[in-house]
Amino acid sequence: MKAIRTLGIFSAAVLGTVSLAACSTDGAGQSGNAQKVSLVSANGWEEGTAVSELWKAVLEDKGYEVELTFLDAGPLYQGLADGDFDVFLDAWLPVTHEDYVDRYGDSLTYLGPWNDEASLTIAVNEDAPIDSLEELAENAGLFSNQIIGIESGAGLTSITQDAVIPGYGLENMDFVVSSTPAMLAELKAATDAGDNVVVTLWRPH
């Protein structure tokens, strides 16, 4: 995929670790001499994949038996709250995953951040003919009059709908609410074809 660039950062974020509230490795979940740990990561969130694979390797080196599962955000948090998984290492707070934490927070424990310099953004292809969000409304036709978004339940989606679109006069653009994999597929297809595209995105990714 060709390079992309940010038009504007509209929310700071912290990447943190969330676990099942009752999660414990003391004498439970053992198979022979190996304790089991179940990690879960969100589809399409590459920084989550990286940190999950890192901790999978670290835990396996310490003698744990580790299972890593990939899901969309909704089923991920539901499964975590239901006890199907022990740890999620890529919780985006306070905005992107806010709705899920509000819904399932009583069943979860926040273990703290590992990256406090993340951000939510609107991004375009590197060679796009605009340089800022202020220019997007008057050049919407160059981007098929669309902003490609992710899941409806994501805080990134709600802040785009409630703050970015009205704040920058983008009400006449079609905000396509889809999924993270669908957004990334649209982004890749457009950049590979040399077309202009505007998406909701985040850093790191």
Task: Tell what function each PLM region has.
Residues 24-39, 59-60, 137-144:
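Immediate post-signal peptide segment of exported/extracytoplasmic ligand-binding proteins
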Residues 43-46, 67-79, 175-186:
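Short helix-initiation/N-cap motifs at beta->coil->alpha
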Residues 99-111, 194:
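Ligand-binding "clamshell"
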Residues 106-153:
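A conserved helix-loop-strand patch within extracytoplasmic ligand-binding domains
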